[in-house]
Design a protein with these regions (language model features):
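Sec-dependent N-terminal signal peptides
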Residues: 6-18
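C-terminal motif of bacterial Sec signal peptides marking the signal peptidase cleavage site
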Residues: 22-26
């Protein structure tokens, strides 16, 4: 072996050692966490690492702050994993979601924010959720009177029941749900509704049909949650049978546009951007946006 070969090998060895040192350093470097437990106003989030779900108003609202480190994840299960692992300090969610998450995990809590006061700047359309139908569909005109007939008291009572159910999804609630239709006639066909089935308390998957859960098409699992019960009520009032389809968030609107589903009931806000793609009913629920965080040890 000549000197040149030895020199090349030596240089290569040094480079490998340097890469190893840098890699080791980056692996052992820890992110400085921010304690959110004493924060009562959104201004207190400065410098924190906060996440939101991709493609949602939550992410838009978060990006508008400008003083936080923003991360995004494709669904709420990944947001929860990131929070528990310490990758983020908190994430944006509707208050019912926060209530559900906290009820299931005592190590978590949330910042009680109020829209346009201590919290995010948002309109009712931004934080409300509505049913989406294909552009030009006559279903909006049919469903709006049904939604209008659901009182604010019934909506709140149903959400309280749903949050309780979400803490133990396969356990019977032991009481009649606040929103139930008396119509059992399904002669008007089938209503195909898409949702994530992964966004408690609005929609989730469970192993049994407890508490009026609906079998997910093409799956052995059942869907339940606020969206499911609203979908059941709307379908019943229309005299239709209900089918639930589990669909990833980014595929919901394309699937509706393609005619794969009749509607979307998935905790979806009727933002101006989405209104260019689909038609929305009036909102069937409104909520504050809050921040879920992990309690300090």
């Amino acid at each position: 072996m000549n000197r040149r070969s030895i020199t090349i090998i030596s240089i290569t060895a040094v480079i490998c050692i340097l890469i190893s040192i840098v890699t080791l350093g980056s692996c052992t470097e820890k992110r400085e966490k921010v304690d959110l437990s004493s924060i009562t106003n959104i201004s207190g989030l400065a410098g924190a690492t906060i996440a939101a779900q991709t493609g949602t108003f939550h992410l838009d609202a978060l990006n508008s702050l400008g003083n936080v480190n923003v991360k995004e994840y494709e669904d709420f299960s990944k947001l929860l994993v990131a929070l528990k692992s310490g990758a983020i300090d908190g994430y944006v969610a509707e208050e019912p979601t926060a209530l559900s998450v906290v009820a299931m995990d005592p190590t978590l809590d949330y910042i009680h924010l109020v829209n346009n006061q201590t919290g995010f700047t948002a309109t009712d359309a931004d934080t409300g959720i509505a049913v989406a139908f294909k552009t030009g569909s006559d279903m909006v005109a049919k469903v709006n009177p049904i939604i209008a007939g659901i009182s604010a008291e019934t909506r709140s009572a149903l959400m309280a029941q749903i949050v309780t159910m979400s803490a133990n999804t396969d356990k019977a609630l032991g009481e009649t749900l606040a929103l139930v239709s008396s119509n059992t006639n399904t002669s008007n066909g089938t209503l195909k509704i898409a949702m994530e089935c992964n966004y408690a308390p609005f929609n989730w998957s469970q192993t049994t049909d407890a508490n009026g859960a609906v079998r997910i098409q093409g799956s052995s699992l059942y869907a339940n949650g606020y969206d499911v019960q609203v979908a059941k009520y709307i379908a019943a009032e229309l005299g239709m049978a209900l089918e639930i389809y589990a669909v990833e968030w980014d595929s919901l609107i394309p699937g509706l546009q393609a005619g794969t589903y009749d509607g979307i009931i998935a905790g979806m806000s009727p933002t101006s951007e989405r209104e260019e793609q689909v038609d929305f009913t009036d909102c069937y629920y409104n909520s504050n946006l809050v921040i879920i965080y992990k309690k300090a040890n």
